C-alpha cells in the first residue's frame, strides 16, 4: 500500500510538472490567470513545472528506499501539500470566496494526498 500511495502522488506531481512545462497557460487557465508575458510563463514553468518534477523525483526515490529516507521524503512532501491546502483555506478566511472547482477540488486533492503520505509509514 505504501508504494501505491507514493506512486499515485508521484504521478500526480509528474503530470503537473510536465503539463506546466509544456503548456503553462493551459495549466493555470482554470484559476483565471493569464500568461501574456514570457516572464509569467517562466514563473509557472518554474513553480509548477520544476517543483512538480522535483517532487516526482524524490517520491520515486522514496518508493525504492524504505526506512528513514522514505519517511523523511513522505513527511516533507506531505508538508508541502498541506501548506498548499492551508493557503487555500487562509484565502477563504481572508474573504476570497471561490467556487468548488478549481480551488476546493485541489484543496481536497492536496489534503487527501498529504494525509495518505503521512499514514504510509504509520501502520
Task: Enumerate the language-model features and the residues they cover.
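N-terminal signal-anchor transmembrane alpha helix
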Residues: 3-20
Amino acid at each position: 500500500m505504501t508504494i501505491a500511495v507514493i506512486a499515485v502522488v508521484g504521478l500526480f506531481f509528474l503530470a503537473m510538472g510536465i503539463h506546466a512545462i509544456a503548456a503553462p497557460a493551459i495549466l493555470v487557465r482554470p484559476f483565471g490567470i493569464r500568461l501574456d508575458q514570457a516572464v509569467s510563463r517562466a514563473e509557472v514553468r518554474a513553480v509548477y513545472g520544476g517543483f512538480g518534477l522535483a517532487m516526482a523525483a524524490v517520491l520515486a526515490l522514496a518508493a525504492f528506499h524504505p526506512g528513514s529516507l522514505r519517511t523523511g521524503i513522505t513527511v516533507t512532501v506531505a508538508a508541502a501539500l498541506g501548506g498548499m491546502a492551508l493557503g487555500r483555506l487562509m484565502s477563504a478566511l481572508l474573504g476570497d470566496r471561490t467556487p468548488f472547482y478549481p480551488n476546493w477540488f485541489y484543496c481536497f486533492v492536496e489534503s487527501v494526498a498529504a494525509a495518505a503520505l503521512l499514514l504510509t509509514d504509520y501502520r
